[in-house]
Amino acid sequence: MKKFLPLLVLLMLMPLFAAAEDAVQYDAILSRDTYLVEEPGGRSIIQLPDREQVEVLSLGEEWSRIVYDREVGYCKTGYLYHFVSRDPFSYPVPDRQRVTGFASFNVATDIKGGKFNGLTAQPGQVFCVMPGEEEYYRVPIWRDAAQVHQAEVTYYPFADWQSADSGDVIGGFTTFYGEQQGKGKAAEREHNIVLGCERIHETVIRPDGYFSFNKLCAPYSQNNGYRYAPNISQTGFGYGGGVCQLTTTLYNAVLTLPLQVDEWAMHRYTGIQYAPQFFDAAVGSYSDFIFKNTLPYAIRILATPQNGILTVLILRE
């Protein structure tokens, strides 16, 4: 009997190994009609409808192994978007912006990128950056990036969340806004951004606690202090227009850390101009942005509007 014990143990553990291998890494949405296939380039199993949600078991450069309607197979990775990680510690969201720290301007600096008309940043204004070439930092701006010379700023790398001390900045993100988004109501749009920042600024989320944007900022109405400004809707205007830029900035800041996104909606497939496609976050009567603090300590949110530079930083409390 003893000689069969290792075999019995192995047989008992096999389902656990299979379960681990088949663990869902992400939820995602299909961007088009396609087919679930047995293996990359292989025979079709079932049709996959456009805009349906699937579970991603493994994410590959060209093909991903997924589950749809209890069927397991493969589809092209390029047909998937709206990724929500089931385990942000092990599976960060693909194609997120890899910002590594924040900086403050030492001198007045002209900055522009993509279709953004640009602005003159003032000394002391804070923004998040990515590594650049040689003596430059890269600043994500409107689906593009600007180059800022290191001599013009003071740089502070994000602290590693695992070894951070109280007060350390561990994540963040920046987006840019201006007159060209206003449709004649740029001041009203900026008012809404500033009001939203005031309502989430200094919010502390305890370990295993949840942050709900709507809990702090909704309803988006005149009675709640918001002004009529451009938004993404059938009419193109609404009370609270511009607040979603704050939500988007916060969402991308959250993605710099292993925090669990619980509820998140995009405006539309094409996205919005001030953030990369598939990385905007809409809020309203029927949508919220909610995440869970999965870190072993409390975190604090700092939301700072700076005359066209909107920066959200996340600190260890």
Where are these predicted regions, by residue range?
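SH3-family beta-barrel domains
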Residues: A19-Y35, Q47-D50, L57-G60, Y81-K115, ...
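Short alpha-helix capping/helix-loop boundary micro-motifs
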Residues: E38-R43, K112-K115, C197-E198
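A mature extracytoplasmic/lumenal domain signature
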Residues: P40, G60, Y68-R70, Y79-Y81, ...
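Polybasic, low-complexity association/targeting segments
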Residues: D160-R206
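Exported/periplasmic cell-wall-interacting domains
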Residues: Y210, C217-E317
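Sec-dependent N-terminal signal peptides of Gram-positive bacterial secreted proteins and lipoproteins
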Residues: K3-A20
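SH3/SH3-like beta-barrel superfamily modules
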Residues: I46-G78, N117-P157
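Solvent-exposed, conformationally flexible loop/turn segments
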Residues: R51, G124, I205-F211
